[in-house]
Amino acid sequence: TQGGSKQVTHLEGLTEALKFGMDEKPRLVHRLDKETSGVLLLARTRNVAKHLSKAFQQKKTRKIYWAAVAGVPTPNLGTIKYGLVKSTNKDFEKMRCVHPGDVKKIDGAKQAETDYMVLTQLAKRGSWLAMVPVTGRTHQLRAHIAELGHPIIGDKKYGNMSQQNLGDGWGAKLGGDLSDDLHLHARYLKLEHPITKKPLELVADLPPHMAHTWKTFEWSSKDFSDDPFSDFLE
Protein backbone atom coordinates (compact mmCIF):
# COMPACT_ATOMS: atom_id res chain seq x y z
CA THR A 1 0.00 0.00 0.00
CA GLN A 2 2.92 2.35 0.66
CA GLY A 3 6.27 2.82 -1.02
CA GLY A 4 8.98 0.74 0.60
CA SER A 5 12.22 -1.00 -0.14
CA LYS A 6 12.47 -1.63 -3.91
CA GLN A 7 8.73 -0.92 -4.22
CA VAL A 8 7.92 1.37 -7.16
CA THR A 9 4.17 0.86 -7.68
CA HIS A 10 1.98 1.34 -4.61
CA LEU A 11 -1.50 2.62 -3.76
CA GLU A 12 -0.26 5.77 -2.05
CA GLY A 13 1.22 6.84 -5.37
CA LEU A 14 -2.14 6.38 -7.11
CA THR A 15 -4.33 8.46 -4.79
CA GLU A 16 -4.49 11.36 -7.27
CA ALA A 17 -6.46 9.09 -9.61
CA LEU A 18 -8.86 8.20 -6.77
CA LYS A 19 -10.12 11.74 -6.12
CA PHE A 20 -13.33 11.13 -8.14
CA GLY A 21 -14.19 14.83 -8.27
CA MET A 22 -13.23 15.61 -4.67
CA ASP A 23 -10.84 18.47 -3.89
CA GLU A 24 -8.62 16.32 -1.68
CA LYS A 25 -6.82 13.09 -2.45
CA PRO A 26 -7.91 10.14 -0.29
CA ARG A 27 -5.53 9.31 2.53
CA LEU A 28 -4.35 5.91 3.72
CA VAL A 29 -5.09 5.39 7.41
CA HIS A 30 -3.52 1.93 7.77
CA ARG A 31 -1.53 -0.41 5.57
CA LEU A 32 -1.28 -3.93 4.17
CA ASP A 33 1.86 -5.78 3.13
CA LYS A 34 2.27 -5.67 -0.64
CA GLU A 35 1.37 -9.38 -0.99
CA THR A 36 -1.60 -9.28 1.39
CA SER A 37 -5.12 -8.90 -0.03
CA GLY A 38 -8.32 -7.67 1.55
CA VAL A 39 -9.95 -4.70 3.25
CA LEU A 40 -8.06 -1.42 2.98
CA LEU A 41 -9.50 1.82 4.33
CA LEU A 42 -8.89 5.27 2.85
CA ALA A 43 -10.23 8.57 4.18
CA ARG A 44 -11.81 11.16 1.90
CA THR A 45 -10.84 14.21 3.97
CA ARG A 46 -8.06 15.29 6.32
CA ASN A 47 -10.39 15.41 9.33
CA VAL A 48 -11.76 11.93 8.69
CA ALA A 49 -8.22 10.61 8.22
CA LYS A 50 -7.24 12.07 11.59
CA HIS A 51 -10.26 10.46 13.27
CA LEU A 52 -9.67 7.05 11.69
CA SER A 53 -5.93 7.06 12.36
CA LYS A 54 -6.67 7.76 16.02
CA ALA A 55 -9.14 4.86 16.11
CA PHE A 56 -6.47 2.47 14.80
CA GLN A 57 -3.86 3.80 17.22
CA GLN A 58 -6.21 3.43 20.18
CA LYS A 59 -7.22 -0.09 19.11
CA LYS A 60 -10.85 0.87 18.59
CA THR A 61 -11.00 -1.21 15.44
CA ARG A 62 -11.40 -4.96 15.00
CA LYS A 63 -9.40 -6.69 12.24
CA ILE A 64 -9.71 -10.36 11.26
CA TYR A 65 -7.31 -11.97 8.81
CA TRP A 66 -7.69 -15.33 7.09
CA ALA A 67 -4.73 -17.49 6.17
CA ALA A 68 -3.98 -20.95 4.84
CA VAL A 69 -0.96 -22.45 6.59
CA ALA A 70 1.15 -25.59 6.49
CA GLY A 71 0.20 -28.07 9.19
CA VAL A 72 -2.16 -27.46 12.11
CA PRO A 73 -1.17 -25.24 15.05
CA THR A 74 -1.80 -26.58 18.54
CA PRO A 75 -3.72 -25.67 20.52
CA ASN A 76 -6.47 -24.81 18.05
CA LEU A 77 -7.10 -21.50 19.82
CA GLY A 78 -4.24 -19.47 21.20
CA THR A 79 -2.28 -16.26 21.59
CA ILE A 80 1.27 -15.71 20.32
CA LYS A 81 3.31 -13.19 22.30
CA TYR A 82 6.78 -13.34 20.75
CA GLY A 83 8.48 -9.97 20.47
CA LEU A 84 9.72 -8.86 17.05
CA VAL A 85 12.99 -7.26 15.96
CA LYS A 86 14.15 -6.34 12.47
CA SER A 87 16.83 -8.64 11.07
CA THR A 88 18.71 -7.49 7.97
CA ASN A 89 21.04 -9.30 5.61
CA LYS A 90 22.41 -8.28 2.23
CA ASP A 91 19.34 -9.51 0.35
CA PHE A 92 16.28 -8.51 2.37
CA GLU A 93 14.82 -7.50 5.70
CA LYS A 94 12.60 -9.68 7.84
CA MET A 95 11.33 -9.76 11.39
CA ARG A 96 12.85 -12.16 13.91
CA CYS A 97 10.87 -13.48 16.86
CA VAL A 98 12.32 -13.12 20.34
CA HIS A 99 11.14 -14.43 23.71
CA PRO A 100 8.74 -11.98 25.39
CA GLY A 101 11.04 -11.82 28.40
CA ASP A 102 13.94 -10.69 26.21
CA VAL A 103 12.21 -7.82 24.42
CA LYS A 104 13.55 -5.13 26.76
CA LYS A 105 17.07 -6.57 26.50
CA ILE A 106 17.30 -6.40 22.69
CA ASP A 107 17.80 -3.08 20.94
CA GLY A 108 14.92 -2.37 18.56
CA ALA A 109 12.74 -5.26 19.73
CA LYS A 110 9.04 -4.56 20.28
CA GLN A 111 6.30 -6.47 22.03
CA ALA A 112 3.78 -8.14 19.71
CA GLU A 113 0.62 -10.17 20.22
CA THR A 114 -1.49 -12.25 17.83
CA ASP A 115 -4.67 -14.22 18.55
CA TYR A 116 -5.35 -17.17 16.25
CA MET A 117 -8.01 -19.82 15.75
CA VAL A 118 -7.97 -22.95 13.59
CA LEU A 119 -11.26 -22.85 11.69
CA THR A 120 -10.81 -26.12 9.83
CA GLN A 121 -8.03 -28.39 8.64
CA LEU A 122 -6.98 -30.82 5.94
CA ALA A 123 -5.95 -33.77 8.11
CA LYS A 124 -2.60 -32.65 9.58
CA ARG A 125 -1.33 -31.21 6.31
CA GLY A 126 -2.81 -27.74 6.23
CA SER A 127 -5.32 -25.51 7.97
CA TRP A 128 -7.44 -22.39 7.63
CA LEU A 129 -6.77 -19.84 10.34
CA ALA A 130 -8.46 -16.69 11.54
CA MET A 131 -5.98 -14.27 13.10
CA VAL A 132 -6.25 -11.00 15.00
CA PRO A 133 -3.24 -8.66 15.18
CA VAL A 134 -3.67 -7.32 18.72
CA THR A 135 -0.61 -5.20 18.02
CA GLY A 136 0.28 -3.94 14.55
CA ARG A 137 3.94 -4.76 13.96
CA THR A 138 5.52 -5.21 10.54
CA HIS A 139 4.99 -8.76 9.19
CA GLN A 140 3.59 -9.71 12.60
CA LEU A 141 1.13 -12.40 11.52
CA ARG A 142 3.57 -13.96 9.07
CA ALA A 143 6.48 -14.07 11.51
CA HIS A 144 4.41 -15.25 14.47
CA ILE A 145 2.72 -18.19 12.78
CA ALA A 146 5.95 -19.24 11.05
CA GLU A 147 7.69 -19.27 14.44
CA LEU A 148 5.20 -21.96 15.51
CA GLY A 149 6.35 -24.05 12.53
CA HIS A 150 3.28 -23.37 10.39
CA PRO A 151 4.22 -20.80 7.74
CA ILE A 152 1.56 -19.24 5.54
CA ILE A 153 1.26 -20.89 2.13
CA GLY A 154 3.12 -18.83 -0.45
CA ASP A 155 5.20 -16.91 2.10
CA LYS A 156 8.60 -16.80 0.45
CA LYS A 157 10.10 -14.69 3.21
CA TYR A 158 9.03 -16.63 6.30
CA GLY A 159 8.21 -20.02 4.80
CA ASN A 160 11.50 -20.98 3.18
CA MET A 161 13.09 -24.41 3.30
CA SER A 162 14.96 -23.67 6.53
CA GLN A 163 11.67 -22.99 8.30
CA GLN A 164 10.46 -25.85 10.48
CA ASN A 165 7.37 -27.32 8.86
CA LEU A 166 5.06 -29.78 10.55
CA GLY A 167 2.69 -30.03 7.60
CA ASP A 168 3.15 -33.32 5.73
CA GLY A 169 3.13 -32.62 2.02
CA TRP A 170 4.13 -28.93 2.16
CA GLY A 171 6.74 -29.39 -0.57
CA ALA A 172 4.07 -30.95 -2.78
CA LYS A 173 1.76 -27.98 -2.20
CA LEU A 174 -0.36 -30.07 0.13
CA GLY A 175 -1.40 -32.34 -2.71
CA GLY A 176 -3.19 -29.64 -4.69
CA ASP A 177 -2.53 -27.29 -7.57
CA LEU A 178 -1.99 -24.29 -5.33
CA SER A 179 -0.78 -20.81 -6.16
CA ASP A 180 2.65 -19.64 -5.00
CA ASP A 181 1.12 -16.30 -3.96
CA LEU A 182 0.79 -15.41 -0.30
CA HIS A 183 -2.35 -16.86 1.29
CA LEU A 184 -3.01 -14.02 3.75
CA HIS A 185 -6.20 -11.97 3.46
CA ALA A 186 -7.61 -9.07 5.49
CA ARG A 187 -11.13 -10.47 5.64
CA TYR A 188 -12.98 -8.22 8.09
CA LEU A 189 -12.74 -4.74 9.60
CA LYS A 190 -15.12 -3.29 12.19
CA LEU A 191 -14.99 0.29 13.42
CA GLU A 192 -17.15 3.28 14.28
CA HIS A 193 -18.19 5.39 11.30
CA PRO A 194 -16.46 8.77 11.75
CA ILE A 195 -19.57 10.75 10.75
CA THR A 196 -22.64 8.75 11.79
CA LYS A 197 -20.91 7.13 14.81
CA LYS A 198 -22.67 3.87 13.92
CA PRO A 199 -20.81 0.53 13.74
CA LEU A 200 -19.31 -0.05 10.31
CA GLU A 201 -18.39 -3.57 9.20
CA LEU A 202 -16.38 -4.20 6.03
CA VAL A 203 -15.84 -7.63 4.46
CA ALA A 204 -13.61 -8.50 1.50
CA ASP A 205 -14.07 -11.61 -0.65
CA LEU A 206 -11.10 -13.90 -1.11
CA PRO A 207 -8.77 -13.09 -4.01
CA PRO A 208 -8.78 -15.58 -6.93
CA HIS A 209 -5.69 -17.53 -5.84
CA MET A 210 -7.05 -18.10 -2.33
CA ALA A 211 -10.57 -18.84 -3.61
CA HIS A 212 -9.01 -21.57 -5.76
CA THR A 213 -7.25 -23.06 -2.73
CA TRP A 214 -10.47 -22.97 -0.70
CA LYS A 215 -12.28 -24.77 -3.54
CA THR A 216 -9.48 -27.35 -3.81
CA PHE A 217 -9.70 -28.10 -0.08
CA GLU A 218 -13.52 -27.92 -0.09
CA TRP A 219 -13.53 -25.07 2.40
CA SER A 220 -16.41 -22.58 2.28
CA SER A 221 -16.38 -18.93 3.36
CA LYS A 222 -19.98 -19.42 4.46
CA ASP A 223 -19.04 -21.95 7.15
CA PHE A 224 -17.87 -19.33 9.65
CA SER A 225 -18.92 -15.87 10.74
CA ASP A 226 -16.81 -12.83 9.95
CA ASP A 227 -15.62 -12.75 13.58
CA PRO A 228 -15.41 -16.38 14.75
CA PHE A 229 -13.68 -15.33 17.99
CA SER A 230 -16.88 -13.59 19.09
CA ASP A 231 -18.85 -16.78 18.42
CA PHE A 232 -16.45 -18.75 20.61
CA LEU A 233 -16.73 -16.30 23.51
CA GLU A 234 -20.53 -16.20 23.48
Give residue spans per PLM region.
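Short solvent-exposed strand/turn elements
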Residues: 134-137, 206-208
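Short histidine-centered loop motifs in beta-beta connectors
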Residues: 129-132
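Short alpha-helix capping/helix-loop boundary micro-motifs
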Residues: 125-127
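RNA pseudouridine synthases
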Residues: 1-93, 101-113, 121-123, 183, ...
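Long C-terminal interaction/binding lobes of large macromolecular proteins
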Residues: 116
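Short beta-strand segments enriched for Tyr within beta-sheet-rich domains
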Residues: 52, 137-145
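Active-site beta-strand termini and strand-to-loop segments that position acidic
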Residues: 121, 134, 191-194
